[in-house]
Amino acid sequence: MEKTKNSKKFWIALVIFSLVGQVAWVVENMYFNVFIYKMWGASAGAISTMVAASAVAATVTTLLIGALSDKLGKRKIFICAGYILWGFSICSFALIRLDVINALFPAAASAAAVGVSLVIIMDCVMTFFGSSANDACFNAWLTEAADTANRGAVEGINAMMPLLAILVVFGGFMGFDLDKRESWTAIFLIIGITVVVLGIAGFFLIQESSIKAQGNAHYFKNIFYGFRPSVIRGNPVLYLTLIAYAAFGISIQIFMPYLILYFTVTLGMDNYVLIFAPAIVLAAVFTAFYGRVYDRLGFRKAVLPALILLLVGYVVLYFFRSTAPVFIGTLLMMCGYLAGMTVFGAMLRDFTPENKAGMFQGQRIVGQVLIPGIIGPAIGAAVLQNAETIIGDDGTTSFIPNENIFLAAFIAAIFIFVLLAPLFRKLRKR
């Protein structure tokens, strides 16, 4: 098989679009929870609702835009224009402030309730643009730009970006007091403008995919293409991988929406960035090389060590609260998380039917975002239902996350091994 020749522009586009896109997602997935918790006194249920609504928006968007980009045979315009609009939508969060809400809704009984509702609504709007650009079209473009000879290497770089994005965000957030509203205004403007600039740069960096538009002419049929029983039967490895990936994502989403709050509120680690940074750097380096394990040894020998690392990380985080063990547990958990994403992501790309990458991005999002985004945070919220509470300076009551989120994540992760069994059997028969 002839190896895909990737230009320098491809690697530059891969790194910066993946990194900046992940920075935006990190702020949404890890800090929007902090934003509505600190600024609006949101409950665990409200946080779970926000994550679930965003997951639904991401899935529907990816299904619609993925099929549309296949029909038109275009990726570049959706990526670039999508990033520009994505950036503007991020900037709009700078306007969700108490003074603005009081001016627009003077009769509202609770400005906090209005604030939480606006954040959830605008999160869905932002997710529409972000999923159009990143989930649907950037991922489809990436699938088409690589092949089985370098898939693991490309996916390794792509999969380590969430960790690097966390490092960038954590480092950047050190200069802000997250208890002050003006800090959040600056954060949303800085990130939003950066995403807009990148979208403009994409017109000069991204080379259009070679997908043929005339081969995918039936738009509405394409939207539901991946859900047809005949397609599922014809691609058993792909769908078994999606099911296992969904279980993996559920385990992650049980604790992830509450992770920063757990470290800052429960453990009182105001210097959590200094603890996270070394763990993130080491995990990012580990992930960059781990993609080659998939290339050389295959899925089975790559996914099992990743899951074991994840489970050990959960155990350490559940039993220990002091700085050193928390660092070790975080490192192991992050290594397992990102390595697992690398392996599952590469597997999905390798078994995506040729010239139908866009139509299958919706199915990827169902397994990677929708199912985990609805079930995971709901389990986390149920676990925290009777958690201790504190009363803030403004009189609002807030919950205190506890270590049981890691126990629940561990139990959920055990089911991944059960779901991998039929997948391994299918792979042995190939």
Model-derived regions: residue spans:
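Juxtamembrane intracellular "pre-TM" segments in multi-pass secondary transporters
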Residues: 1-8, 209-243
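Helix-loop boundary and gating motifs at the non-cytosolic
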Residues: 2-55, 237-267, 273
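Hydrophobic core of transmembrane alpha-helices in multi-pass small-molecule transporters
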Residues: 19, 89, 96, 103-133, ...
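Glycine-rich segments within core transmembrane alpha-helices of 12-TM secondary carriers
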Residues: 58-59, 152-174, 365-377
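Helix-to-loop junctions at the C-terminal end of transmembrane segments
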Residues: 60-74, 286-299, 384
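A membrane-interface helix-boundary motif in multi-pass transporters
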Residues: 75, 176-193, 384-412
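Structural signature of the two symmetry-related core transmembrane helices
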Residues: 77-92, 301-316
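Multi-pass alpha-helical transporter architecture, strongest
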Residues: 93-100, 196-206, 402-430
